[in-house]
């Protein structure tokens, strides 16, 4: 299936996400901070289908990582995760670089849906409207 780089400093979250996505058939590479993720990305010449990154991390945060990836590998899809509302706000205005932001905590179902949507390239607005329609909103 897809080749996914996960950048997450919380080992429990990183392992949960990695196991779930590997179980779904994806090839997973893990990095415990944004700096290491950027190094891996360069070493592998951006050979990933998706970067799934936390926003708040040591060395290089997810926003800086997304900017680096957008500069060096503009076709790579970036999906961010965060548990901090102020960090979600930092991602606003970067819609051209970032597919979406997943708020933490999230369920396995939400993770899998967001990853599938990102890999399929579904526009975020269309995805949101479809979910609202399904929920009767």
Pin down the residues of each PLM region.
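Conserved acidic carboxylate
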Residues: 8
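Charged docking surfaces used in two-component/phosphorelay signaling
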Residues: 15-23
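Receiver (REC) domain active-site loop signature in two-component systems and cognate sites
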Residues: 57
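Acidic catalytic/metal-coordinating carboxylates
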Residues: 33-36, 61-65
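Alpha4 helix (beta4-alpha4-beta5 surface) of REC/receiver domains from two-component response regulators
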Residues: 64, 84-102, 109, 113-114
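Acidic, metal-coordinating helix/loop segments flanking the phosphotransfer/catalytic sites
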Residues: 30-50
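C-terminal output helix
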Residues: 106-115, 123, 127-128
